[in-house]
A protein has these predicted regions:
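A cross-family acyltransferase "interaction/gating" segment
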Residues: 16, 24-95, 99
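A cross-taxonomic marker for long C-terminal extensions/tails that follow the last structured domain
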Residues: 87-121
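Alpha-helix C-cap/termination motif
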Residues: 10-13, 48, 107
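Membrane-interfacial amphipathic helices and adjacent loop/beta segments
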Residues: 1-15
Length: 121
């Protein structure tokens, strides 16, 4: 719970916090299910009074299993406001976030010259 409190304090003090909403990173190119942690953390931080912006990001490497010094691309989608999901469930939030992340990942895959089916479900 220390890490959760620390994350909320980072957000409250207007620092940026990077979270992989899947809970981990995959090295085999397979999609992971989004966890509930990002939504819950953002809601906790929002209770402290600060508006919360979520910035979906897609990352792609030259190879499905990255090698040392491989190239990569990171594409950043338009931020959205947590308040837009004030009355939404975790599943509704994650559905929207996943679609934003997938858009960013497609753009990143194109940037590194990989086929779209290398990464998509």
């Amino acid at each position: 719970l220390f890490s959760l409190r620390y994350a909320v304090e980072l957000i409250y003090s207007k620092n940026q916090l990077v979270i992989f909403p899947e809970g981990k990173i995959t090295t085999n190119g397979k999609k992971l299910k989004l966890k509930q942690g990002l939504f819950r953390l953002a809601k906790l931080a929002r209770k402290k009074g600060e508006p919360i912006k979520i910035v979906p990001v897609g990352i792609a490497y030259d190879n499905v299993k990255p090698k040392f010094r491989d190239g990569f691309a990171m594409c950043i989608e338009k931020p959205f406001d947590l308040d837009d999901f004030a009355n939404s469930s975790v599943d509704e939030f994650n559905f929207y976030l996943k679609s934003c992340i997938q858009e960013a990942e497609v753009k990143a895959l194109i940037q590194v010259g990989r086929k779209l089916d290398d990464q998509l479900e």
